[in-house]
Amino acid sequence: MATRVRIFISAAPGEEPAREQLGRALAELPVNIGWVIKRTPDVDAVPECHLFALVLGTDIWAPVGLELWWARRTEKPILAYAADVSRTPAGQAFRQENAFLDWKRYTDLPALRRAFLRDICRFLLLHPDRYGVTVVEAETLRGFVAQLEQSATSLPIGKATGAGGGGVILAPGKDMTPGARLVGDTRSS
């Protein structure tokens, strides 16, 4: 049975719009895969994740450094994104101390979204059996990545509206538990 992808998104409180953008981006993927999204400050969830995403803005906040340490210690794949902004001295030091990461710079939220989606697609293409990616979905992902690399369409940047929190994105047909029903569903089972 396919496994839901467990992703941990580590970011300072000031990066809430960026974190929200990443959560929304997962729902855009053209594949039928379930996602479990955990986020700062849930340090205990880092060892259970399959993938660790780090977003660095102007400053670094606790416990982001500890979360990164746990991700490295438990050998998680790390996706690192750094906003193209001036950083505080602490933010500069954190970036320098972690220069070994494959940092992807982004200038705005649409650029972050594109970089993140490319990385997620590549991750899924490396592990198709584990996450239940079919041959057709793999080809669709390759086409999706090609579109991302060609287009640089802008998305409106706004304030966070709540989609950046932790959550679960269910894959219809793959994540349905027998006898389960939606909250608020009044039909009898």
For the regions a protein language model found, what residue spans apply to each?
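Cross-kingdom TIR/SEFIR domain
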Residues: 20-32, 41-126
